Regions:
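Surface-exposed extracellular loop regions of Gram-negative outer-membrane beta-barrel proteins
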Residues: 209, 216, 220-223, 240-267, ...
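Periplasmic-side early beta-strands and strand-to-turn transitions of outer-membrane beta-barrels
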Residues: 157-159, 164-279
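Outer-membrane beta-barrel signature, preferentially recognizing the C-terminal barrel domain
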Residues: 277-280, 285, 291, 319-324, ...
Length: 839
């Protein structure tokens, strides 16, 4: 309830504003997939203009977003970034949808985006729209975090030819590369980025075209200590080549744009469980977009071919080839009599994966990832200052044959100062990604017979309906000594224990008889074949204890089959301007996540508790000895006394036998191969979490050329355990992997002509990363404590001639090294000189 008290308090405060303000008339299209005013967008949205983009040259376009409120740019290297908005940060994937002119850039199904392997070029970006919050009501399954939409430059408004060359370096040992020694600068000055853009059109602008080409290469910072031991401490030189060309056709009532592009990239990617891998991929895409009146349609095809993928930790090829297609269409309809604007749309997404059995294993022939969906969006003016918006979308996900409806409702209230209050509720549904669904590969060998440990995707669940156990190879011949071994009994036969301790046990009994002079103790030993035969009874078993291989107890429990997770968001936002210079926005949101996915070891080792085996085997042996003595005619009391000696000695040896074998083998799941050991890791669903956060952004325009900005993002809780996800006894954990506090601020001087300058900083507090939501985060490479950091960035540029300019961009001006996650590269300073010439 306390979360809602904060919302109510803020609601009252926002309504109390009574400031002289002006309305923002800028339009955005990414929030609702249709044009709407910025302050009336369905989601909190930020625009990054072409002027801002061109003033800060970057080696990777995602670094342009680092100063934007609510955006978490996870820097993993010089040219390796991941981006997220309000969802938990992942090492590899993102719930943020990235678009270029409406074309999805993510590798659908994997939820993966690599800007260096895309054709995005800073020379060709006209604007960026950052849409924060759930967008599943129009974009479909998986769009729970928001949208980042890049709009490229068309040839009609941006004709001409431009060449841009960037050269720079990095510091690998801290400090400043610009002020470092000549040797240090020489050894690290190895960043190169060459961009080319040409665009033109005919006289009546009915036809236009553009061409973009880019080549870059770079080394990278040193990797973490653990990774360093695996790959020799330094990552290889990486490169990327991108090319795309677009044709634009304009008629009286239509326009058609076709784009073809290709990319060839070698770099480093990281997976949250299996560390670094060298990634080589060649991609090509074709896109056609048609607009006619209120109707639009778009088709996109992408093919990704991996040519050299090698996971350093696993020591194996880990490439995932794919063919991806996306067809979308939409229609906009105005109903003036009802003061309503309607927007309809439908999508069909299909991606086919091919790993050659190396990553998706047994799922290789059933890993097609398809969703089909349709949406409607309706915006109605109820009163002069009140609008309502409803969006709803239904999607069907073929992998688990499940459908889901994602609704969204928004109320807009415009006050008498020109500000807009936005109150919204939305629900999104997220499928597991293909890596979670289909993974089936070896991460560690368990012997020479092909046995291995590795993940198993949750498209199907692992079960133990008919469990058996499989002994380790060195014990197989020993287990086979039983005439009818019962591997369906999860326990050790006392027959095997008897064979295991027979020689030292018999010797001890003989020594005891000789030492005590009680020769009656020899009788069962002299009839040892009768003792062994009695152990063959099916009841003479001691149950195994199950553990994880390190001695930690485990239950015999299968894994869960994939289910859609649900995320419900309540949001209150207010934006306004004070006078002509100061603008601000405040967004407070509450997010409830249900059906969280975690990962755990499913296959247990089998072992024997020494105390239990000692007691049960000793008792069994005593009963056998007692029977032999009674059959020989000894009185009951004498037989019992002698049998107790057998119980004590036999129990002691049995306990030692159990203690000497920490693992006898593995329990076989119903899905386990018969001929090898397979230690499975897989997924399970648990609980729900609830947290709230806020994004506050301010901007002050000193004059037409200079401005100051500051923003703050806050989340009240980022680590969830015990009663946060279930009850006080729950072992489950969930981490957002986002710091609670993030502050960004800066000064920008960017006149239409002459010198431009920018100085900014980014602060975030410390956090504990747990990328797999595992109860033991020490098992995984990138988990652990991440210290707080403050990073200063600077850019300066000036014209040399009317057509040529030079820029310097310095990331991490102070050169204080930091890591995004444990065992990732230590990020130092990066300096980049850029020369741009317009023909």
């Amino acid at each position: 309830m306390k979360n809602y008290n904060y919302l109510i308090l803020l609601f009252v405060l926002l309504l109390s504003f009574n400031l002289t303000a002006q309305q923002n008339s800028e339009e955005v299209t990414a929030a609702s997939r249709t044009a709407e005013k910025l302050n009336e967008a369905s989601n909190s949205t930020t625009i990054i203009s072409e002027k801002e983009i061109s003033s800060k040259k970057s080696f990777n376009v995602l670094s342009l977003l680092e100063g934007t409120v609510g955006v978490n740019v996870s820097r993993q290297g010089v040219n390796s970034f991941n981006v997220s908005l309000r969802e938990g940060v992942d090492v590899f994937s993102t719930r943020t949808v990235l678009l270029s002119d409406g074309r999805e850039l993510n590798t659908y199904g994997l939820n993966f985006f690599d800007a260096s392997a895309s054709t995005l070029s800073g020379l060709d970006i006209a604007r960026v729209e950052v849409v924060r919050g759930s967008s599943s009501a129009v974009y479909g399954l998986g769009a729970s975090s928001g949208v980042i939409s890049f709009t490229t430059k068309n040839p009609f408004d941006y004709a001409g030819t431009t060449i841009q060359v960037s050269s720079g370096g990095i510091t690998k040992f801290g400090g400043s590369i610009l002020a470092g020694s000549a040797k240090n600068v020489q050894s690290n000055w190895n960043l190169l980025d060459v961009n080319f853009r040409h665009a033109d059109h005919n006289e009546d602008k009915s036809f236009g075209y553009k061409i973009n080409a880019r080549y870059s290469e770079n080394s990278d910072w040193l990797v973490g200590d653990q990774t360093s031991q695996t790959i020799g401490g330094e990552l290889p030189v990486m490169h990327s080549f991108n090319f795309d060309t677009s044709l634009y056709f304009k008629g009286e009532d239509y326009d058609v744009t076709t784009t073809f592009g290709l990319n060839d990239t070698e770099n480093i990617s990281r997976r949250k469980m299996w560390g670094e891998e060298k990634r080589g991929v060649s991609s090509k895409f074709f896109n056609v977009k048609v607009n006619s009146g209120n109707f639009h349609a778009q088709y996109n095809y992408v093919q990704n071919d991996t040519k050299e993928n090698y996971n350093y930790w696993i020591g194996a090829d880990h490439g995932i080839d794919s063919q991806q297609s996306h067809f979308q269409l939409g229609y906009e309809l105005s109903l003036p009599s009802l003061s309503t604007e309607l927007n309809f749309g439908a999508d069909n997404r299909l991606i086919k994966f091919d790993t050659g059995g190396k990553v998706f294993g047994s799922y290789e022939d059933e890993d097609d990832f398809r969703t089909v969906g349709a949406f409607v969006s309706s915006k109605t003016k109820l009163f002069d200052n009140v609008d309502v918006l409803f969006q709803g979308r239904y999607d069907h996900f073929n992998v688990i044959n499940e459908g889901a409806f994602s609704p969204k409702g928004v109320i807009f209230v415009k006050d008498n100062t020109g500000g807009t209050l936005r109150l919204s509720m939305s629900q999104s549904n997220n499928p597991d990604d293909a890596y979670t669904l289909f993974s089936d590969f070896s991460t560690q060998s368990l012997g020479s017979n092909g046995s291995y440990m590795g993940p198993y995707g949750n498209k199907r669940g692992l079960t133990f309906n008919n469990p058996t156990w499989k002994p380790w190879p060195n014990l197989e011949s020993f287990v086979a000594l039983h005439p009818t071994p019962r591997l369906d009994i999860l326990g050790i036969s006392h027959f095997h224990v008897m064979l295991g301790v027979l020689q030292p046990f018999a010797q001890t009994m003989i020594q005891t008889a000789m030492a005590t002079g009680n020769m009656l103790l020899l009788y069962p030993v002299q009839n040892i074949e009768l003792v062994i035969a009695s152990m063959l009874s099916g009841a003479n078993y001691t149950d195994f204890i199950l553990h994880d291989g390190l001695g930690n107890p485990m239950d015999l429990k299968g894994s869960d089959t994939s289910q859609l997770s649900t995320e419900t968001t309540y949001e209150l936002g207010y934006s306004n301007t004070i006078g002509d210079k100061f603008s601000y926005s405040v967004d407070v949101y509450n997010i409830q996540k249900n059906n969280i996915v975690g990962m755990r070891q499913v296959t247990p080792h089998v072992a024997i508790d020494p105390a239990t085996l000692g007691a049960e085997f000793g008792n069994n042996l005593a009963n056998t000895a007692y029977g032999l003595y009674r059959n020989a005619g000894l009185p009951a009391a004498t037989a019992a006394a002698l049998a107790n000696v057998y119980a004590a000695v036999g129990g002691q040896f049995a306990a030692g036998f159990a203690a000497g074998i920490p693992s006898l083998g593995l329990v076989q799941a119903d899905q386990s191969p018969n001929d090898i050991h397979r230690l499975y890791w897989s997924h399970y669903n648990f609980g729900e979490i609830n947290y709230w956060g806020a994004d506050i952004a301010t901007n002050y325009e000193i004059n037409s050329a200079a401005s100051l900005y500051a923003n703050y993002s806050f989340i009240n809780q980022t680590e969830f355990t015990r009663e946060d996800v279930g009850d006080i006894t729950s072992p489950d954990v969930y981490h957002l992997n986002i710091p609670k506090h993030r502050v960004k601020a800066g000064f920008v001087y960017n006149p239409d002509k002459g010198l431009n300058f920018g100085l900014s900083f980014r602060y975030q507090n410390s956090m504990n990363a747990n990328t797999l939501n595992s109860g033991d985060s020490s098992l995984f490479w990138f988990d652990g404590f991440v210290p707080k950091r403050t990073v200063w960035d600077m850019n300066v540029g000036m014209p040399i001639t009317s057509k040529t300019r030079i820029d310097l961009t310095v990331d991490n001006v102070l050169g204080k090294k930091y890591q995004t996650f444990v065992n990732m590269p230590m990020i130092g300073q990066q300096a980049l000189f850029t020369l741009t010439h317009n023909f």
